A protein has these predicted regions:
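Conserved NTP-binding catalytic cores of kinases and kinase-like/nucleotidyltransferase enzymes
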Residues: 20-126
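Short, solvent-exposed loop/turn and secondary-structure capping segments
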Residues: 42-43, 62, 83, 102-105, ...
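Internal "kinase-insert"/substrate-recognition segments embedded within catalytic cores
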Residues: 93, 97-99, 108, 113-115, ...
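Hydrophobic h-region of N-terminal signal peptides that target proteins for export
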Residues: 6-18
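Short, well-structured beta-strand/strand-turn elements
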Residues: 134-146, 271
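Middle-to-C-terminal accessory/interaction subdomains
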Residues: 26, 37-39, 81, 85, ...
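Positively charged n-region of N-terminal signal peptides that target proteins for export
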Residues: 1-4
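Structural recognition of the beta-strand scaffold that forms the well-ordered cores
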Residues: 89-93, 103, 108-113, 121, ...
């Protein structure tokens, strides 16, 4: 009997998969891997071709065509989202820079699946939009798109600019790998506070005795001098964060305004993982430059609404840096000033954004739910309405 039921479930999934098709309301990206090879690795790129059919939708242009596809490489990406779902996220590297769907020219993009987003695909969408609204220095651009991989419709995806050092993204000097010149290692850093220990990183012990992981994105390979510099910098920040809360010394090394804006965005959406993983910050070249928090990235843990009043008070994740930072009166005064101004003059516009997203995504979300019935967002109106309710209580 169990085998029979399993067979029925398999056949249902197969029939559903084959029956699902793109909605025709969003551009469609066609990807063909070499020899139809399956994408099974996050480490190794596969050769592939692609083209984007804009379907005549206003504001978008075709890229390549079925008869003249363009070259690219593709691999898996993500951690839990890669392991935990059949609908996979991907990282793509184009052979030539392209302005995909009106975004700045680049070779580097992600196709985010958001299979874990049961809030109407709004977790990242709202988080990114709030980041733009509140004035973060750069926020990744996103375009919803439907994807056909090796002839198979795989649903609604979000074509997203990846975080990298670039004049159109994190606009700082790019520090060379294995640099040894003391004057050149003071900046050009892009670092992530990470909750995974599977990428090149350094670790320090926090003031509370917990270990904190810093994955360095740029540079990617460190000399002894670079590793020493980064370790010293993170140790100094940690010491100051756990030090005298009435001292202003921390703000000589950290951009208080950027951190306050970053923090407010995370609080609005109740992203309880925000200072534990996918927490990016960077430092420009120069002896007196400061560490700047941002850009925002992963809002997969947003809108869960823990019982804690503030994100750092929840027990789901270890986020003691922000918990300590919020004890600094000067920081909280700056947060209140930005929040009051933002709330009075701009915050209500987020509801126009969610309304527009509902209109834009509804039919594609239905097609996606047909393709992935286990974790789709078929009733988009109900789910986005819930997000609006949560935003009103932020």
């Amino acid at each position: 009997m169990k085998r029979f039921i399993s067979l029925l479930l398999f056949l249902f999934t197969l029939i559903t998969s084959n029956a699902a098709s793109y909605s025709g309301t969003l551009p469609v990206m066609h990807i063909q891997t070499k020899n139809n090879a399956p994408i099974v690795s996050k480490e190794d790129y596969l050769e592939a071709t692609y083209y984007i059919d804009a379907l005549g939708i206003s504001g978008y242009q075709n890229v390549g065509s079925a008869t003249t596809p363009l070259s690219m490489e593709i691999k898996g990406r993500g951690n839990w989202t890669w392991r935990g779902f059949d609908k996979k996220p991907y990282r793509i590297k184009l052979s030539d820079k392209q302005p995909l769907l009106g975004m700045n020219k680049s070779k580097h993009f992600a196709l985010l699946a958001h299979a874990d987003d049961n809030k109407g695909f709004m977790r990242n969408a709202v988080g990114f939009e709030l980041s733009r609204m509140i004035g973060m220095k750069w926020t990744p651009e996103v375009r919803p798109i439907e994807v056909i991989l090796n002839g198979d419709y795989i649903g609604l995806y979000f074509l997203t600019e990846t975080i990298r050092v670039d004049k159109d993204r994190v606009n700082i000097v790019e520090q060379e790998d294995e640099e040894t010149d003391a004057d050149k290692i003071t900046g050009g850093w892009l670092v992530e506070i990470d909750n995974y220990d599977d990428s090149p990183n350094i670790k320090i012990t926090e003031g509370c005795g917990e270990e904190i992981i810093f994955t360095y994105k740029t540079p990617e390979i460190l000399s002894v001098q670079q590793e020493q510099f980064l370790t010293q910098e993170m140790t100094r920040l940690n010491t100051l964060i756990y030090g005298d809360k009435h001292s202003d010394e921390l703000w000589q090394y950290v951009d208080i305004d950027a951190l306050a804006r970053f923090y407010i965005v995370q609080e609005i959406v109740d992203n309880y993982e925000s200072f534990h993983g996918s927490c990016y910050f960077y430092r420009e070249l120069g002896e007196n430059e400061k560490w700047t928090f941002g850009p925002v990235w992963d809002f997969g843990s947003a809108f869960f609404y823990s019982k804690a009043q503030y994100i750092y008070q929840g027990r789901e994740h270890h986020m003691t840096w922000i918990g300590e930072i919020c004890k600094f009166p000067r920081f909280m005064e700056h947060v209140k000033k930005i929040w009051n101004n933002f709330y009075d003059s701009q915050f209500s516009a987020i509801f126009n954004f969610t309304s527009n997203q509902l209109t834009l995504l509804s039919k594609a979300a239905s097609s996606d739910a047909q393709r992935w019935p286990k974790y789709g967002n078929a009733n988009l109106s109900k789910r986005i309405s819930k997000v609006n309710d949560l935003l009103r209580t932020s």
